[in-house]
C-alpha cells in the first residue's frame, strides 16, 4: 500500500501515542488510509475522530470480545463466536452489528478486519452498547478465519 503518500494527520501528542499503540500499522500510514476512507466523511477533525475510535476500542478491549480473539490466536475463529461475544458484552442483538473480512495469505484465510456498524452520533463518551447498529445489514465475507499472531509468517503486511 502507498498510504504514506496520503496527507499526514495532525494529532495531539497524547492521541498520536495512543493511536500508535493501538494501531501498529500507523508506521506505514494506516491511520491516513483510515481517515481518508472512513473518518473525513464523519464531519469531525482527525483528532476528534481518532479520540472517539480509541475510546470505543478501549471498551472493546475490556470486553469478552478481546478474549475470544486472544483465545483463537493461531486458530480458526468463526463469526458465530465473535457475535456471541458481542451479545455477552453489549446485549441482545449486538452480534448483528459485526462482520468479519478475511484475506488469503500463505494458503490460509486470515481475519483481516472486524467491522462494527455504528449509529450516529457517536461521541468520545458514548457507551459502545448504545451506538451499535443492530440491523444486521452487512454479513461480511468470512464465516471462519485464522487469527494471526503478530509478527508471524502469515501476518498481513501493509
Language-model segments: which ranges?
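An N-terminal structural lobe/cap that precedes and organizes the functional/catalytic core
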Residues: 1-22
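C-terminal, well-folded lobe of enzymatic/effector domains
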Residues: 19-158
Amino acid at each position: 500500500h502507498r498510504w504514506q503518500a496520503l496527507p499526514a494527520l495532525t494529532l495531539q501528542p497524547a492521541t498520536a501515542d495512543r493511536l500508535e499503540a493501538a494501531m501498529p500499522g500507523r508506521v506505514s500510514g494506516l491511520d491516513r488510509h483510515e481517515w481518508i476512507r472512513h473518518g473525513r466523511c464523519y464531519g469531525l477533525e482527525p483528532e476528534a475522530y481518532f479520540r472517539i475510535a480509541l475510546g470505543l476500542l478501549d471498551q472493546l478491549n475490556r470486553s469478552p470480545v478481546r478474549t475470544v480473539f486472544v483465545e483463537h490466536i493461531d486458530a480458526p475463529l468463526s463469526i458465530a463466536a465473535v457475535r456471541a461475544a458481542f451479545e455477552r458484552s453489549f446485549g441482545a442483538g449486538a452480534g448483528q452489528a459485526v462482520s468479519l473480512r478475511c484475506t488469503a495469505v500463505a494458503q490460509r484465510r486470515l481475519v483481516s478486519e472486524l467491522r462494527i456498524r455504528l449509529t450516529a452520533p457517536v461521541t468520545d463518551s458514548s457507551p459502545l452498547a448504545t451506538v451499535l447498529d443492530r440491523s444486521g445489514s452487512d454479513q461480511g465475507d468470512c464465516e471462519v478465519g485464522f487469527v494471526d499472531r503478530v509478527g508471524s509468517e502469515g501476518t498481513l503486511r501493509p
